[in-house]
C-alpha cells in the first residue's frame, strides 16, 4: 500500500512536460490511450449527431503534430505563445502535444496560423 501512495505522490508531482512524456510512454509501449478528462469515449450512433456536436464546440486545444524542418522557429513561437522557458519550449516541441488548451476558436486559429507559418504541422482538437 505504501508503494501505491509513493507512486501517486510521484505522479502528482510531475511537471507538464513529464506528464506528456508519461502519456507517450503509456501509449507507445503499453497501448493505453488517455481519455480526455477521464471521460469514456463512445462512438456516436448517427453521423449527423457527431456533426452537430462539432458545430457547437466553442473551446479548442491547439495540438502540435510535427515541428517540421524549422524547429528553431517553432520553438520561438511556442515560447511566445506559452511563456515557457527555452528548455521547456524545446522539450514540448520535440515531444509534440497540446500547446494550448480550452481556447476560443479565434485564438486557436491565430495560434495555429503562427505555428504553421513557422513550419509546424498543427491541428485543432
From Swiss-Prot:
Protein name: Large ribosomal subunit protein bL12
GO molecular function, one term: structural constituent of ribosome
Species name: Ruegeria pomeroyi (strain ATCC 700808 / DSM 15171 / DSS-3)
InterPro entries hit by this protein: Ribosomal_bL12 (IPR000206), Ribosomal_bL12_C (IPR013823), Ribosomal_bL12_C/ClpS-like (IPR014719), Ribosomal_bL12_oligo (IPR008932), Ribosomal_bL12_oligo_N_sf (IPR036235)
Secretion signal, residue range per the UniProt entry: none
Annotated CDD domains: Ribosomal_L7_L12
Subunit structure: Homodimer. Part of the ribosomal stalk of the 50S ribosomal subunit. Forms a multimeric L10(L12)X complex, where L10 forms an elongated spine to which 2 to 4 L12 dimers bind in a sequential fashion. Binds GTP-bound translation factors.
Keyword match Ribosomal protein: yes
GO CC terms, sorted: cytosolic large ribosomal subunit
Amino acid at each position: 500500500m505504501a508503494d501505491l501512495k509513493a507512486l501517486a505522490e510521484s505522479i502528482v508531482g510531475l511537471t507538464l512536460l513529464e506528464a506528456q512524456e508519461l502519456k507517450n510512454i503509456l501509449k507507445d509501449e503499453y497501448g493505453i490511450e488517455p481519455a480526455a478528462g477521464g471521460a469514456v469515449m463512445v462512438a456516436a450512433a448517427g453521423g449527423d449527431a457527431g456533426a452537430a456536436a462539432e458545430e457547437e464546440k466553442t473551446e479548442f486545444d491547439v495540438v502540435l503534430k510535427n515541428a517540421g524542418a524549422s524547429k528553431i522557429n517553432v520553438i520561438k513561437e511556442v515560447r511566445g505563445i506559452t511563456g515557457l522557458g527555452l528548455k521547456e519550449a524545446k522539450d514540448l516541441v520535440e515531444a509534440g502535444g497540446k500547446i494550448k488548451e480550452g481556447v476560443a476558436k479565434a485564438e486557436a486559429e491565430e495560434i495555429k496560423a503562427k505555428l504553421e507559418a513557422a513550419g509546424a504541422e498543427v491541428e485543432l482538437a
